[in-house]
Amino acid sequence: PSSQPRGDPTGPKE
């Protein structure tokens, strides 16, 4: 998701 940071452990890089 673009709403999640790419380095965020709770947000996949996708």
From Swiss-Prot:
Superkingdom in the source lineage: Viruses
Miscellaneous field: The Z-84 isolate was taken from a 54 year-old Zairean male. HIV-1 lineages are divided in three main groups, M (for Major), O (for Outlier), and N (for New, or Non-M, Non-O). The vast majority of strains found worldwide belong to the group M. Group O seems to be endemic to and largely confined to Cameroon and neighboring countries in West Central Africa, where these viruses represent a small minority of HIV-1 strains. The group N is represented by a limited number of isolates from Cameroonian persons. The group M is further subdivided in 9 clades or subtypes (A to D, F to H, J and K).
Subcellular location: Host nucleus, Host nucleolus; Host cytoplasm; Secreted
Keyword Zinc: yes
Identification of the protein by name: Protein Tat
Residue interval(s) of motif Cell attachment site: 6-8
Signal peptide: none
